[in-house]
Amino acid sequence: MKWKIKGFALVSSIAITTLLTGCTLGLNPFGEKEKMDPPDVNYVKNAKDLKNEVGKSKETAKSITTELYLVDKNGYVVPASLPLPNTQSVAKQAIEYLVQDGPVSELLPNGFQALLPAETVVKSIDVQNGIATVDFSKEFKNYKAENETRMLQSVVWTLTQFDSIGSVVLRIEGKPLTEMPVSKTPISNKLTRQIGINTETTQLADVMNSHPITVYFVASNKKVNYYVPVTRRVSNASSNDVVAVVNELIKGATVGSNLDSDFASDLALIDTPVVGNGVASLNFNQNLYTSLTDKNKTVSKKLIDALVLSLTENKAIKQVSVTVNGSKELTGEDGKPLSAPVSRPNKVNTVAF
C-alpha cells in the first residue's frame, strides 16, 4: 500500500480557561521535516472576540477537524485529528475515513494506518437516544485476527468523540453482531469506551473486582511526540478514580512499551483531590517541578497534557487545577503562568497542514 504524505505537524492544544489560548505542542510523528516551526499562539481576549471568531469559522470553513482512531507503527490505537470535508453526516464520514485505501489515504501521517478492511462500505449510521447503530457491508469481515480488538476500539472511540453518541451497536448487512467475525470476540448490545483502548492485561488479573481507567502516555519519534491512551484495570477497592489515575501516571509506562512519561517516581499527592463544578483540584509535592533548583517553578508540558487528558476522560471533570504545596505559582515550559485551571483540548494530536 502506498500513501501520499503531505507536510504536517501533530499538535495538541490545552486551553487555559481564562485566556482560551490556541497554544499548541508541535508534534510530527515519523515525518521527515528538517525544521519545525514554532507553534502559533492566538489569544481570544473576550467573549465578543470569541463570538466573532466562531462566526467567521462557520462562514469560511471547508473542513471539519475530526478525531480518527488509527493504528501507529507500534500497534497502538491513537487519536489523530484530521481535517475532513465539512458535511452534515460527520459521524458517518468519520467511520468512512477509517477504511483502508479509502479517502483517508491522502491524509495519513507517516507511520499511521486505518484499521477497517479495504472496500468496507458504511451502509448507514442511525443515531437515536445517544446510541449509534452502524451497518457495515460484508467486507467488514475481511481482517486479520490480530486487528480484531483494535478495529472495535477504533470504531467505538471514533464515534464516541461526538457529544450525541454514548454507545455503539454494530451490524453487518443489517444483522446485529453478538461477536466479531474472525476471533469471535464477544460484543455487548451497546459498546462504550468502557471496552478500553490499548488495554494492558498484565496489571490486574481480577476482572470481576476491578474497573478500567484510561491514562495517556507519550510516544515519540526522534524529537517529536504524540499522546497515546492506555487502559489499565484498577481494584474496586480504589474508591477515588482521580487518585487512581494519578497513581498510574506516576507508575509510568510499562517497560518495553515504547511509551514514556514525565511523571517522577517520587511525585505524590499531598492532599486528597477535590472535584467540584467540573474542576479537579490536585495538590502535589515539589517533585512536580522539572527541577527542584528551578526558580521559575517550571512544570513539564507533557506532564500537564497527560494529566489533563487522563483526568478528563471522566466526563464529570472538565478542567484540572494544579498546585504545589498549596501554591499556584507554577510556570509552563512556554514561560506562562499555570495558575488557572486547564481544560481538555477539543481535539487531540491534531494534524496541521
Label every PLM stretch briefly.
Residues 2-353:
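Bimodal "functional hotspot" detector
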